[in-house]
Curated annotation (Swiss-Prot):
The lineage of its organism: Bacteria, Pseudomonadati, Pseudomonadota, Gammaproteobacteria, Enterobacterales. GO terms for molecular function: peptide transmembrane transporter activity. It holds the Pfam family SgrR_N. This is Uncharacterized protein YbaE. One of its GO terms (biological process) is peptide transport.
Amino acid sequence: MRLLNRLNQYQRLWQPSAGKPQTVTVSELAERCFCSERHVRTLLRQAQEAGWLEWQAQSGRGKRGQLRFLVTPESLRNAMMEQALETGKQQDVLELAQLAPGELRTLLQPFMGGQWQNDTPTLRIPYYRPLEPLQPGFLPGRAEQHLAGQIFSGLTRFDNNTQRPIGDLAHHWETSTDGLRWDFYLRSTLHWHNGDAVKASHLHQRLLMLLQLPALDQLFISVKRIEVTHPQCLTFFLHRPDYWLAHRLASYCSHLAHPQFPLIGTGPFRLTQFTAELVRLESHDYYHLRHPLLKAVEYWITPPLFEKDLGTSCRHPVQITIGKPEELQRVSQVSSGISLGFCYLTLRKSPRLSLWQARKVISIIHQSGLLQTLEVGENLITASHALLPGWTIPHWQVPDEVKLPKTLTLVYHLPIELHTMAERLQATLAAEGCELTIIFHNAKNWDDTTLQAHADLMMGDRLIGEAPEYTLEQWLRCDPLWPHVFDAPAYAHLQSTLDAVQIMPDEENRFNALKAVFSQLMTDATLTPLFNYHYRISAPPGVNGVRLTPRGWFEFTEAWLPAPSQ
C-alpha cells in the first residue's frame, strides 16, 4: 500500500500541468497532496533522490519554486511493479494495477503466464473470482477442489491414466479376505510443509477429525474404527466390506492436513499466501513423489480482466493469456475436452407430479431442441445424451392424454448457465399449460438450505473429477439433495442398495451394479443430465506440459517453462 500511496501522490503533483514544468508554492503542493507542508517537502526530497523529479525551492515563506518531472506516472508504475515482483511482493503489484479494465489488461499482460523471476520458474494464472477458503471435507468449486489436490495428499490417490486408486502417503495396502480389515503402509520419508516429519498418529488424528463432519461420516459409514497398528501402518476396521474404500481415501475430500494446522499439508505445493487478490503456491522441497518442475504458481484474482466486453469469458476454468498485447495472437488452445460432469435435473414424484408427467417434462427437454438452443455462449456446452459414456438416457413415447400439472416449482443453484435453462424451461412448460415457479439458491451446492423441501424439480451441477463411477456413488451417498428427492423409505432403500454394491470385490461387477442403479433413476424419471461443458485451456508458446484434468484444470506438477535465453 505504501507504493500505491507514493504513486498517487506523484500523480497529484503531475496532473495539473500534465507533466510540464510548474512554478508553484509548497503550500499549494501540500493542499494538492492533502498533507502538511512539512510532509510534502519530505515527498519532494524522496522523489528527487529517486530520480523522479527536480525541485528547486526558493527561500522564504510563500515563494514559488520550480518543479520539473523526469518520469511519467505510467513508467513509474511499471518500474514499481517490476521492483515489487523481483522482491516477491505480488500484493503490491495488484494494488498498483488498480485501473480501468482495459488498462488493467495492458498493464498486467507482461506479468501473466510463465515467467522466470529471480531464476525461479513461476506460473501466474489470472482468475475471475476470489477463491473460497479451503475447508476440510467437500468443497463447492472446481478451482478449490483442484487447489486442495495440490496442497494436500491422501493415503491413496487416483492414477492419472487408469483413474484407479494407487498409493500416495501409503505406498501399499492390503485387504483381509473378508474385506473387513484394510492395512495401509506409510512411506517412511514423509514431511509436512513446515518441515516436520509425518507420524502415523498425525494422520490418525486428522482422519478422526474428518469423520466428525456429517458428510464424511456418511461417506465412511462402513468404518468401525481406525487404529495405528504400527508406527508405519494405519488400519481400518469395517462394519461391512467396502471395496470403494481406497477410492474414498483418494478423493480430495479425504486428503489430510496437519491436525494442528489445517492449511499445512504434504502435497507437491505448499500454500504461502491466500488473500482475496492473490493465492501463491510454492513447491514442497520434501515432497514424497515426483517433484514439480515449477517453483511457484500464483492465482491473480483480477475480475476486470474477464469482463464480457473484453472478449474473455469467465466461464472458462483456466485461461492463461500472457505476453505483450501484440503477442496475444500467439496464445493458442493447448488442451480441450468435454466434461464428464454435467448439469442435471431431478424430479420428485408426488400427488402433484406423476411418473408419466415427470417423463413428459424430461421428453420435452431432450426432444424439443431446448438444450441445443440455449443462449449461454458459443461452444460452451453440449447437450447430454448419457449420464456417463454408455449410460444412455432413456426415451419414451408419452401418451397424448398425459397433461402436465397446472403449477410446478423449480429450485436450482449455480452455475450461471442454469439461469438461462430455468427461464427457457419456464417458457416451454407455459406453452404446455404449466406455470413454473422458479426459486434460485445462490450457491454452488445444496448445503445450508432447505429450499428443496418445497420443490418438484431441482437443477444443479454435478462435478466429476477422477474415477467417474465412484464419484457418482459418492454423490448418491453424501449429497443433501437426495433426501429431498425421495421419501424416507425410498431414500433408505437407495442407501441399502449402495451398501449392496460396495461389498462386491470385483470392480467390473461394482460398476455394472452402480450403472443399474442410475439407469433405474433415469427410467423412473427421477434424474436426467442436461448438458456437459467444453473444457479449454489456452497457453502461449513456452508454457509446456499443460494437460487437461477431469476437473477442467491442469496438473501443476507437470507444467514447465524452458530456461530463458541469454
